[in-house]
Design a protein with these regions (language model features):
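Glycine-rich phosphate-binding loops that contact phosphosugars or nucleotide phosphates
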Residues: 90-93, 97, 105-264
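Glycine- and acidic
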Residues: 69-80, 108-111, 137, 159-170, ...
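Extended, charge-enriched "interface" segments that sit outside catalytic cores
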Residues: 1-104
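Structural alpha-beta junctions
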Residues: 32-47, 134, 192, 215, ...
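Helicase-primase coupling helices
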Residues: 332-406
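Active-site phosphate/pyrophosphate-binding segments
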Residues: 184-357, 362-366
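General structural feature for long, well-ordered alpha-helical segments within catalytic domains
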Residues: 29, 33-36, 40, 80, ...
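Generic amphipathic alpha-helical segments used as scaffolds and interaction surfaces in large
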Residues: 17-31, 72-82, 241, 286-289, ...
């Protein structure tokens, strides 16, 4: 059997594959990791069963339940997922169908999402990556006045629904963005509250403000959903439904992948193999960076999303046993083939202090023009991916390739 075949994880029914042949996990390495593998499988089962995962805050971590509420450990938690989900879908449908309208316009045409970190990165990624026919999406994700006014001045204010997202309701950047937006609406003669939606914890500062000021809608964010993993919660689903995304399909895709990555078989579990590859590449301490190279314009924000998800999750001074480890994985990236004209030169010839994650999207929806005999732009894109991966491999640089059918 070829090295490629040995190191391939493929889910044909999902159209997804992961190629570890440029960062191979041999039997000797897997054997040396068996104790950690067994613990990870056991800890994952405990986590999804409701074990306390955050010892500092004494709370569960339940973002996995969002994709399949049947996994929630209590009926109350299941209801806390199903109820808001139904409410989100109904709200989005009513906005897009024109049943919920702004006071001074026939229908909403735009949505302004105000948030930061996980409250913005996930929704921004979905808005940028998934084509849909709903509202035009805009974001305030910083406290830079110039950036905020640039966005605000481009909005059709009377047709804009504002979604303010903050778990605690007291995040300074989000609060600042909300106050600036409120002031901008007022100065332009448009009422803010009737066009405003809050996504926040029950009883938070934002929740109380929205209630007192008579905002259009409030959606509850649970304390067992962390910001960086909240894209499948109301945090991500409210903007997604307004954008016109079929959130049932979004959740179903995540659920199907969850099922594939709960198998105790290491060689057929993509999540476990990714974790092992990261461990091997970084010597278990984050000694190398991860460079994310999606060869698709629609995924240009994916590296930013992964940057928070991975670095905030793994960047720790102490491990769960209380040992000082000061470890993590630094993540950066942009998109291919743009990166080939930016920093791939250093990746190939400079310090070998990274491993790469290539993301291949096999199909293009608009690719009919031949730019050379028998070759389209999409063919060139695929060729650049394969050529860059091979050039890095020839220079002793490790990589993983994730292949998906489309976005």
């Amino acid at each position: 059997m070829s090295l490629y075949a040995q190191q391939l994880v493929r889910y044909p029914e999902l159209g997804i594959s992961l190629d570890f042949s440029k960062l191979p996990l041999d039997d000797a390495f897997l054997s040396s990791m068996q104790g950690r593998i067994d613990r990870a499988f056991a800890d994952m089962k405990a986590l999804e069963s409701g074990a306390i995962a955050n010892p500092d805050e004494k709370r569960m971590v339940g973002h996995y339940w969002l994709r399949n509420s049947a996994l929630a450990p209590t009926p109350e938690l299941k209801a806390a997922i199903d109820g808001p989900l139904a409410d989100v879908k109904a709200f989005g449908r009513d906005v897009l169908d024109g049943k919920i309208t702004p006071p001074r316009a026939e229908q909403y045409s735009a949505a302004l999402v105000i948030g930061i970190g996980g409250s913005a990165l996930g929704p921004e990624l979905v808005a940028d990556a998934i084509p849909a026919a709903g509202l035009d999406m805009f974001f305030l994700d910083n406290t830079d006045p110039d950036g905020m006014y640039k966005v605000l001045e481009s909005l059709p204010l009377e047709e804009t629904l504002v979604v303010v997202i903050s778990k605690s309701g007291g995040t300074p950047e989000t609060r600042n963005g909300m106050l600036v937006a409120q002031d901008f609406f007022k100065k332009n003669g448009v009422e803010f509250a009737p066009q405003a939606v809050a996504v926040t914890g029950v009883g938070s500062k934002l929740d109380k403000t929205a209630e007192a000021e008579g905002w259009l809608k409030r959606f509850p964010m649970e304390d067992w959903v962390g910001g960086r993993t909240s894209v499948m919660s109301v945090v991500g689903l409210v903007p997604a439904v307004l954008q016109g995304v079929d959130v049932d399909e979004l959740l179903e895709g995540a659920r199907l992948m969850d099922e594939k990555t709960r198998q105790d078989c290491v060689k057929c579990n993509a999540a476990m193999k990714l974790a092992l590859a990261w461990y091997k590449a970084t010597n278990g301490k984050g000694e190398k960076d991860m460079v994310v190279l999606p060869y698709k314009d629609a995924l240009v924000l994916f590296s930013k999303y992964l940057q928070q998800l991975i670095m905030e999750s793994l960047g720790k001074r102490l491990d769960l046993d209380g040992n000082e480890v000061c470890q993590g994985i630094s993540v950066y990236g942009n998109k291919g083939s743009t990166d080939q004209h930016a920093y791939v030169q250093q990746l190939r010839d400079g310090v070998n202090n990274f491993f790469a994650t290539f993301i291949e999207v096999r199909e293009c929806s608009a690719d009919a023009v031949e730019v050379e005999a028998g070759a389209t732009c999409g063919d060139f894109l695929q060729g650049f991916l394969r050529g860059t991966r091979q050039a890095l491999a020839e220079s002793g640089r490790s990589s993983i390739t994730i292949s998906i059918p489309e976005v």
